[in-house]
Regions:
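Short hydrophobic/aromatic patches on beta-strands that form ligand-binding or substrate-lining surfaces
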Residues: 188-198, 251-253, 291, 311-313, ...
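Extended recognition patches within non-cytosolic domains
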Residues: 310-362
Length: 362
């Protein structure tokens, strides 16, 4: 009988401990916390803009009966290193000397949710390089309440518009690519900077005709408007809005074979996507791989009239962040980079053959 009583008391004691732990967790969840409502903010730095200002504000998860004091500081550089490692990006942190706060402290009045705004002023922005991406991480603190983990740091991203001063003219030119024998892309990425002078019914960017090609339009076939990006060949889909002439775009097509996910990206933003169930493709098959025109194709060569730069093919599916971060250049020795033409005048040519920057294409 005593053993039963001991077991009973042990069981009751354990239940009390569990209930106490649950109550602590519930109380922690209900406790007001301070945080940033959004974790990421994006700004474009226009030409000749040297100074920029924006408001910084934090908030409470629930109102309190007394005033809550908050303070702000620029987060340490290791925060940016961790972000880059997690998301495969290479943001550069703005120098602390470029940052000026109207005040490092603010307050949230009793019964309110939002702190009074403070102004952040950034200077020296003219020195930012076009095409590079920068970040300012700001941290919120409070001695009155706890901060909400994961949202106590806000990332403010800054970039300058693309400036392309040298590029390859494809109006009457093309590149024929012979990948090493046996090349087979399971996952892959096509990407390029393009600027269209004018649209024909069908405009070749790059790929293997009838197999896997990224192009603009198929108006002659009555399928895709002449200014819409599309994938054609064994698989087909397109975007839902047009490109414009005389404007630079970064365009990309990705396919991740393990997941079957594919996407068409413009300036790092996903414009269309689909699900495929293919093993991959041989870029040397059928007519072979072409950039700018399908030379000798009996149904029409489908030339691209305009300029291209930073033409790349990868044997991996690049992420959205990687596309955004590397529009103006990558290391030719990057893992998975199968083809790279910068087309900025830096390539060497021999006998009408342009040399690939990776050194992998003969």
């Amino acid at each position: 009988m005593m053993n039963k009583h001991i077991f009973y008391y042990l069981m009751v004691g354990s239940m009390a401990l569990l209930l106490g732990a649950c109550n602590d967790s519930m109380n922690d969840l209900l406790e007001p916390k301070v945080y940033f409502e959004s974790k990421e903010y994006n700004f474009s730095v226009e030409d000749e803009m040297d100074v920029m200002t924006f408001d910084l504000v934090s908030r409470l998860s629930s109102a309190t009966s007394s005033q809550v004091d908050v303070s702000y500081s620029v987060a340490e550089p290791s925060v940016v290193d961790e972000y880059n490692a997690k998301y495969g990006t290479n943001y550069e942190m703005l120098d602390v000397s470029q940052v000026k706060l109207s005040s490092t402290t603010s307050s949230i009045s009793s019964g309110k949710l939002y702190a009074d705004n403070i102004e952040v002023e950034l200077s020296g922005l003219e020195a930012l390089k076009a095409g590079n991406s920068y970040v300012l991480p700001m941290r919120v603190h409070s001695s009155s309440v706890s901060t909400l983990s994961g949202t106590n740091i806000a990332y403010f991203f800054f970039s300058k518009p693309l400036k392309i001063t040298k590029a390859g003219n494809f109006s009457n030119h093309y590149i024929s690519v012979k990948f090493p024998v046996g090349t087979f892309f399971s996952s892959f990425t096509y990407e390029a900077l393009i600027n269209v002078d004018y649209f024909l019914d069908n405009n070749t960017i790059m790929g293997t005709e009838g197999v896997m090609i990224l192009r603009i339009g198929d108006a002659g076939g009555g399928i895709t408007p002449k200014d819409y990006l599309e994938v054609a060949g064994g698989q087909n889909y397109r975007v839902t809005k047009p490109l414009l002439t005389n404007r630079w775009y970064h365009v990309a097509l990705t396919y991740d074979q393990p997941t079957g996910k594919t996407g068409i990206y413009v300036n790092g933003e996903k414009w269309a996507g689909s699900d495929w169930g293919i093993d991959g493709f041989d870029p040397n098959s059928d007519m072979g791989f072409y950039i700018g025109r399908i030379y000798g194709f009996k149904w029409g060569e489908r030339p691209f009239h305009g300029k291209m730069s930073e033409v790349r093919v990868w044997s991996v599916a690049r992420t959205e962040n990687q596309l955004k971060q590397n529009m103006l250049g990558v290391d030719p020795a990057s893992e998975g980079l199968a083809l790279y033409y910068k087309l900025d005048g830096s390539e060497t040519q021999e006998g009408g053959v342009i040399k690939d920057a990776t050194g992998r294409i003969n």
